[in-house]
């Protein structure tokens, strides 16, 4: 198990290095691909905890007031790449599309790194622990 955690940490740091080497700006990528739904300040949509008229939840905030930090890196990556419905399954419907066809893996990781960089240390520590438990 420790070997898997070490491997996951190594791969995550490698992806970050690739993103930095390729000059990827996670904040700019977020603004281009995510801000239209999740807000330019990561604030999400109003009443994000209540179902809308279409029966779907509005886009949640990605700042410390939301729940993004409650999830480990793997699930955050898969939701971003494949879309929420594909990851959650069971007929769950979501407006969150997958970006696997339009963003490279390193770009997705750069966006997630940007989001995580905005959280206070308490939320970052909790999220790191969740990642290690995956």
Please name every model-derived segment.
Residues 13-30, 125-127, 134:
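Electrostatic cytochrome c docking/interface patches
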Residues 36:
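Short, cysteine/histidine-rich loop/knuckle motifs that typically chelate Zn2+
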Residues 80-81:
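A short, structured beta-strand/loop element
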């Amino acid at each position: 198990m420790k070997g898997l955690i070490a491997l996951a940490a190594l791969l995550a740091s490698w992806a970050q290095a690739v993103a930095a080497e390729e000059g990827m700006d996670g904040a700019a990528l977020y603004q281009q691909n995510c801000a239209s739904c999740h807000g330019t300040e990561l604030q999400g949509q109003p009443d994000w905890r209540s179902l809308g008229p279409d029966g779907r939840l509005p886009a949640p905030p990605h700042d410390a007031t939301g729940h993004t930090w409650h999830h480990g890196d793997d699930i955050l990556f898969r939701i971003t790449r494949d879309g929420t419905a594909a990851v959650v399954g069971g007929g769950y419907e979501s407006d969150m599309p997958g970006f696997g066809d339009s963003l490279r893996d390193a770009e997705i990781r750069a966006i997630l790194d940007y989001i995580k960089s905005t959280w206070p240390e308490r939320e970052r520590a909790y999220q790191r622990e969740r990642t290690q438990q995956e």
